[in-house]
Amino acid sequence: MSENIDEPFVTDELRKLASIATDMQMTGKMRSHAVDQLGEIGSHEALLVLLNLVANDKLNVEERDLALKRARDIVKKGR
């Protein structure tokens, strides 16, 4: 099986975006932008990160709703 050369980069990028999206010291705008970027990545791994954000009760309802919307968009693209 061939290994995807970009995989370590994507995984690191997902971790960074997830960290930003959950960092309550950041502005809401920055957290929302991180969620949007996760949606743009559109991979299965990004979908899982977004679903983890949806389940995170430390985020406010609007941020969780945005993560759910972006996750839904990824699922729709996969059809």
Report residues per predicted region.
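Structural detector for internal amphipathic alpha-helices that build alpha-solenoid repeat scaffolds
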Residues: 1-10, 19, 29-43, 61-77
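Alpha-helical propensity feature that highlights long, continuous alpha-helices across diverse contexts
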Residues: 35, 51-54
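Short, charge-rich amphipathic alpha-helical segments embedded
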Residues: 43-49
